[in-house]
Regions:
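Conserved SAM-binding loop of SAM-dependent methyltransferases across substrates and taxa
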Residues: 46-58
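S-adenosyl-L-methionine
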Residues: 1-40, 51
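Conserved short alpha-helix immediately C-terminal to the canonical SAM/SAH-binding motif I
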Residues: 68-69
């Protein structure tokens, strides 16, 4: 089990990716042949997606702004005997080309537009992108991806079962309707 955030930052929208949603993303990406070669997990948090991709054989780079979250990810990787390159940097600095980006980025609930730099970086640097997003943002996401020169190659509903992790949460658990998107830059595949 990969631990969650020890001190989740509200402004960074740090929520651990629910295991079932992580499994869905990794399974679909793996079945599509997208976890072979170089993979980046943008906004990797404590490493749930990055470590899953590494377990499946990908050469993974986990990118995260929060050093404390990366410390948890590093420890989980060491405990599992997995190799991941961890980078503490803002996603806006990401420019390395990889075969695939996997991510559960901030959704913009606390900071409107927080998801945009992740989508921009992913579509600019990867041949294939797998992203978990709230279903309520579907129209925006499709338009924005098109504006960035990308295309939605697939979309699947995913229930995101979120546990209470922040002081402002009023319930112990909440299920959010999410969508797993498979995105391509125009001209890819």
């Amino acid at each position: 089990m990969i631990p969650g955030f020890s001190d989740p930052q509200r402004e960074l929208e740090q929520y651990p990716t629910p295991p079932a949603a992580a499994l869905e993303l990794l399974e679909r990406a793996w079945q599509s042949g997208d976890l072979v070669g170089s993979v980046a997990d943008l906004g990797c948090g404590t490493g749930r997606l990055a470590l899953g991709a590494a377990f499946l054989g990908a050469q993974v780079i986990g990118v995260e702004l929060d050093e404390a979250a990366l410390a948890v990810a590093r420890e989980a990787a060491a405990d599992a005997g997995l190799t991941v390159e961890w980078r503490c940097e803002p996603v806006e600095n990401w420019a390395q080309h990889v075969g695939t980006v996997i991510m559960n980025p901030p959704w913009g609930a606390q900071r409107p537009g927080a998801d945009r730099p992740f989508l921009q970086a992913a579509l600019a640097t990867a041949g294939s992108v797998w992203s978990l997003q709230p279903t309520v943002s579907d129209r925006f996401l499709r338009r924005y991806v098109e504006q960035l020169g990308g295309a939605v190659a697939g979309a699947w509903p995913v229930d995101l079962k979120l546990e209470r992790t922040m002081p402002h949460h009023t319930r112990e658990r909440k299920t959010v309707e999410g969508t797993l998107y498979h995105l391509h830059p125009v001209g890819a595949r």
